[in-house]
Amino acid sequence: TMAIVGIVPEHAYDENYGQNPIGSGRYLMKQWDKGQQVIFEANPDYYGEEIKIKKLTVLFMDEDAALAAAMAGQADVAHTAASYADQVIDGYQLLRVASVDNRGINLPTVSPQERNGKPIGNAVTSDAAVRRAINIGIDREEMIDNVLNGYGTPAYSVCDKMPWYNPSAQVAYDPDAAKQLLEEAGWTQGSDGIREKDGVRAAFSVMYTPGDSVRQALAEDLANQLRELGIEVTTEGAGWDVAY
């Protein structure tokens, strides 16, 4: 965390810093209407090259609203999901920006239990064989093509492309090996195609944040792919307060 903290004046770094940030960058925050917009103005004391854009207004919009604003010519730049990359808007050009941001799934690694008065864990994903099978049984390239319109790269960890990324985390897509892992671990297919072990059905839910079309589409694609392995996944839109 400290590696990404900018130069901050000591007198301004207190409990109110998050509401009134001060730094040495190109812009100063002049107005923040929470949940609506934030307005920046050029920093007259900026040490670098001359700032050509003197004022920036960032509007907080969901993906659909951002796309609609661009179509109506109400925004100079609109950030939207790769799932909308096939949209053509007069007067705009599509820019693909390299990023270390990725979208993955978090799976419980402990068996069902209670901690601090709250239930945690999962009887299916606590089996390492299931997690390994999912890792090699998911076709990431298919997800990129079908969900992201080809705008993306496969991810194998939470830190792909970062300096500390370990290339050995990368795995080859091998659905046959994934099925073999599950068989060897005792997860056998039932008459409906879904696996079971010791009376536990290979089924769990995956949550995504409402309003995030990419997370939703990835979750649904994941469910379709895992069913081919004999794992049943249901998808559910829920806020972070519910998911965590």
Predicted regions located by residue number:
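Short, glycine-/polar-rich solvent-exposed loops and beta-turns at beta-strand/coil boundaries
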Residues: 150-151
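Surface-exposed binding/hinge segments that line
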Residues: 1-9
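Short helix- or helix-capping micro-motifs
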Residues: 155-157
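Short clusters of hydrophobic/aromatic residues that line enzyme substrate/ligand-binding pockets
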Residues: 7, 17, 159, 195
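Short aromatic-glycine motifs in intrinsically disordered, low-complexity regions
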Residues: 11-19
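Extracytoplasmic/periplasmic ligand-capture domains
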Residues: 21, 26-147, 163-194, 198-244
